[in-house]
Amino acid sequence: MALPEFSMRQLLEAGAHFGHQTHRWNPKMDRYIFGSRSNIHIIDLSQSIPLLHQALVKVREVAAAGGRVLFVGTKRQASDPVATAAKRCAQYYVNHRWLGGTLTNWRTVSGSIARLRELEGIMGGESAGRSKKELLQLTRERDKLELSLGGIKDMGGIPDIMFVIDTNKEAIAILEARKLNIPVVAILDTNCDPDGITYPIPGNDDAARALQLYCDLIADAVLDGLAAGQANSGVDLGASIAPIEPTLARELTPEPVAEAAAPEVAAAEVAEQEAAFEAAAAPAAPAVEPAPEAAQEATAEAIEAVAEEPAAS
């Protein structure tokens, strides 16, 4: 993925350039105001575009480093877009009511989150033996905690950056973030105070289409950062595996059969067996007897030798 892209036309079509009535403005927003039409301030989108891009880059960096991003928007128009965008990018949100001390008193809030998990366990299958009245009370308590803490119950600590819609309504959340040095990305309408906002984005904070566009861009930046973080920390498992040691390779190699290991010896044994078989199968050859003439000559010589012995004596 790449950093989400947007254009001036998208912002104009979403109505991001419309501010509040001229008599409801905050003079500190004067540098972001282009002019007024029909007593309505017009926001200078030529400044909003680079500021929005800068905010998206920061959100992407935080997500790539494994940081937590908290979406905050408790006004009616922002509630659903904030929750939907946060869930889509696996981040956290507060869209019902900001509880004082959510960030600065996180230990106490963690206790409330533990109670919420306990109630979820009770209602999920441990409700046996409880009366209907008791179950009704537990359900109401769970629903109340879910509205305020359901979006941050898995956060596990304070966020690394916070995205806020309507700084006037979320003034307490911004104050807590400033105390903890948490960067704040905020949509600033013409009636807002830009002081203390780390990454201001001048724009309409009431139009539904504009709010949806802001939330989608922030969520896309988070997703891009998560993808970049995985790519940077990913390990090529195939390249990391060391080659097999020679001794281990020999142990793992199956031994060949005798005929394959010693073909010459096997061939000699087979030849000997075949020769023995042929010899056993062949008929026995008759004994060789001396010729009659040779036998007679040998007998005559023996008689003459015996006859000459007395004469010599």
From Swiss-Prot:
Gene3D superfamilies: Glucose-6-phosphate isomerase like protein, domain 1, Helix hairpin bin
Region named Disordered: 281-301
GO biological process: translation
A molecular function GO annotation: structural constituent of ribosome
Pfam family membership, one: Ribosomal_S2
Keywords: Ribonucleoprotein, Ribosomal protein
Entry superkingdom: Bacteria
Keyword ATP-binding assigned: no
GO cellular component terms, semicolon-separated: cytosolic small ribosomal subunit
Xref: HAMAP family: Ribosomal_uS2_B
Family according to the record: Belongs to the universal ribosomal protein uS2 family.
Record's protein name: Small ribosomal subunit protein uS2
Organism of this sequence: Caulobacter sp. (strain K31)
The gene coding this protein: rpsB
